[in-house]
Design a protein with these regions (language model features):
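Adenosyl-5′-phosphate
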Residues: 1-4, 21-22, 166-169, 196-201, ...
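Cysteine-centered catalytic environments shared across enzyme families
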Residues: 1-350, 362, 366, 491, ...
Length: 675
């Protein structure tokens, strides 16, 4: 695991070693074991290294035999052994045993198709000097991050935004990114909160071609997409396609097939030259991973859990039960309101606003694990591929609700939702009813957004400040060459190009609709799961895991996102992921069948709980001074983005226990670092 960074300069420009060094310093936490930079007159590639495979010899960047092709990567390639054998048989020679060392040779053999051969999590940078070509590639599911910025003097890239900002890239707020963040509580790619700094999308490749007829040119192409479901019969058989065999006709056969794929995924993710531990929440995803890895491990696995004093949020008893059942060496940490001290650390780790409060728990459990091991497995991704979110049950219920008389869904249900007292408890009934009452009146995709939406389009319009001259750039502005320049001396705001109340070029729903339209041939719930896999999984869940773990020099591997398993499950009809109404709407029925002989029955059939932090109660208690200070009207007025009166009303509504959900208040906490 590493942090990677670098630059390719335009003709006539020179590489500034100080800027490159600043990038490496900004990523030192991602690779505390080693750091190195390769440079010629046109390109510089650097890596900070956390040594997992070939601990002593696996330095990056690496080259081919004559030094003409250079590569570095952040991640792990689980099939590097078989790829090395194939390349060695073709005459390639390697400098070390590390997985990165094969990349220049694989590129020589397969050209731009080389990512298709890789099994693992990776963000790769490769410089082909003879062709004047830079290649950036990101893994299929977006497990490892990669960012880039095209500027007046070249293309800069890095694992984290902070490394690009360290070069002095001109800063301006990306208006559309802010608009989407307010609805989602994270910034969805390919945008970042900084205009001109972009995220390379999962399963895509960026190619910088210096030899293009009209000068250096950039192209981004998709090299992997989620396979189509193709079709499903009433018996649940999905027809094969793209060379895939038909699925078994029986549920028992399907369970056996998925069990084999799961075992293969966990085994592949255990490849390491250092001990591998595991995060354990007590939910079915991480519990299945731990149960399988303990069966495969040569000794007792170390597991790590986090809990809370608030019993409605605490899952330590369930994690402890699984640990005892599997025979692991178990470690626990408890999150308390003093975690407010972490706010600034989290802002530094994420570089841009990120309001998923579970990042606090992730930070603390990663810190605990990093004191014992360099690598852990986690159960992340299980909800998106097996069908684990409660909102999928809401999607099924809403489909029925839309067939009921309108007075029930548009008058009676909203009235009931308004009558339920506000609550700070986890999975609060008042918030769930409010969101369902709103969503049942919408089309399926709009409802799917509504189940999680923080600020609606209407609410965002009331939240923005009046036009104020703050530096705000739209996506269209950010793409203009005049706005891509390097200005080392300036972190100042740029002149306004859009009035704040009309920040966005599009509503947030359009982002989801594009992902939904890109996956047309599937059952309804499978299509919605594909939307989540391409947006919230990448930019919320996996971003959270990467930043909180790498801040502590810890590698987290996600076997439930092993691409052969993901591609298999994409073909499985949605009735095996979220049961229909008449069968009880159980979540993850297929995974529960797989887990039946691995875990205690109460763990297998335990309802979905989720990993949440008791922020609502904290913000009324120990964290109240933080809330009222950060969102004080005068401070909000100075920032110039939000209407101070609107923000103050939200704060007061929360503190007084009225209707507004807590996300309305804590959501705005991190924005102070951007504007």
């Amino acid at each position: 695991m590493c942090g990677i960074y670098g630059v390719v300069v335009r003709p006539g420009a020179a590489i500034d070693p100080a800027r490159v060094a600043a990038m490496g310093a900004a990523l030192a936490h991602r690779g505390p074991d080693d750091a190195h930079v390769w440079r010629d007159g046109t390109a510089a590639l650097g890596a900070t290294r956390l040594s997992i495979i070939d601990v002593e010899g696996g330095r990056q960047p690496v080259t081919n035999e004559d030094g003409s092709i250079v590569a570095c990567q952040n991640g792990e390639l689980y099939n590097y052994g078989e790829l090395r054998q194939r390349l060695a048989a073709a005459g390639h020679r390697f400098d070390n045993r590390g997985d990165t060392d094969l990349l220049p040779h694989l590129y020589e053999a397969d050209g731009l198709d080389f990512p298709r051969r890789l099994r693992g999590m990776f963000a790769v940078a490769l410089w082909d000097a003879p062709r004047g070509r830079l290649v950036l590639a990101r893994d299929r599911l977006g497990i490892k991050p990669l960012h880039y910025a095209e500027t007046a003097d070249g293309l800069w890239f890095a694992s984290e935004i902070k490394a690009i900002l360290a070069t002095g890239v001109h800063r301006a707020l990306d208006a559309q990114a802010l608009h989407d963040y307010l609805s989602l509580d994270y910034v969805p790619g390919p945008a970042t909160m900084f205009a001109g700094v972009r995220k390379l999308a999962a399963g895509t490749m960026l190619v910088w071609d210096a030899a293009a007829p009209r000068g250096p040119a950039i192209g981004v192409r998709r090299w992997w997409s989620l396979p189509a479901q193709h079709g499903a019969s009433a018996a649940g058989q999905a027809a094969g396609g793209d060379g895939a065999p038909p699925l078994p006709r029986s549920e028992a056969g399907l369970v056996a097939l998925v069990r084999t794929a799961l075992e293969d995924a966990v085994a592949a993710h255990l490849v390491s030259d250092v001990p591998v531990g595991a995060f354990l929440s007590g939910g079915i995803d991480s519990s299945v991973v731990v149960a399988l890895m303990q069966r495969m491990a040569g000794g007792r696995v170390e597991t790590f859990s986090v809990g809370f004093d608030d019993r409605s949020y605490d899952e330590l008893p369930f994690a402890k039960r699984v640990a005892a059942h599997c025979g692991t060496v178990h470690h626990e940490a408890v999150v308390r309101p003093a975690a407010a001290d972490l706010v600034h650390d989290l802002v530094d780790a994420f570089d841009e606003p990120f309001a998923d409060s579970s990042a606090i728990g992730s930070w603390i459990v990663a810190r605990e694990a990093a004191g014992h091991t360099k690598v852990v497995l986690s159960g992340d991704g299980g909800d998106e591929v097996f069908g684990g979110y409660v909102i999928y049950q809401a999607d099924r219920l809403a489909a029925i609700g839309r067939r009921l008389p309108s007075f029930l869904t548009q008058r009676l249900l909203p009235a009931i939702a308004r009558a339920v007292p506000a609550s700070d408890r986890k999975m609060a009934l008042d918030l769930r009813l409010q969101r369902f009452a709103r969503g049942v009146a919408l089309d399926p995709l709009a409802a799917h957004l509504a189940w999680r939406e923080i600020f609606t389009e209407e609410a965002k319009a009331t939240l923005y400040a009046a036009p104020s001259g703050i530096g705000v750039a739209s996506h269209a502005d950010a793409d203009r060459p005049s706005n891509r320049g390097i200005d080392p001396a300036s972190n100042a705001r740029v002149g306004a190009r859009h009035a704040v109340p009309s920040l966005a070029n599009r509503p947030t729903l359009d982002l989801l609709r594009a992902a939904h339209d890109a996956y047309p041939h599937a059952d309804p719930i499978n299509r919605l799961m594909a939307v989540d896999a391409s947006i919230s999984l990448v930019d919320d869940m996996l971003t959270k895991v990467d930043r909180t773990s790498m801040a502590h020099g810890l590698e987290v591997r996600v076997p439930l996102l092993d691409h052969p398993l993901v591609e298999l499950l994409a073909r499985v009809p949605d009735v095996y992921k979220v049961r229909p109404i008449h069968r009880g709407m159980a979540l993850k029925p297929l995974l529960r069948r797989v887990a039946a002989d691995l875990l205690p029955r109460d763990i297998v059939h335990r309802p979905k709980a989720g990993f949440h932090v008791p922020i609502p109660a904290w913000l009324k208690g120990e964290l109240r001074p933080l809330l009222t200070d950060v969102l004080a009207p005068e401070r909000v007025r100075r920032q110039g983005v939000f209407d101070p009166a609107a923000v103050d009303a939200l704060v007061r509504a929360h503190l007084e226990g009225r209707r507004n959900p807590v996300s309305y208040t804590h959501l705005t906490l991190p924005t102070k670092r951007i504007v």
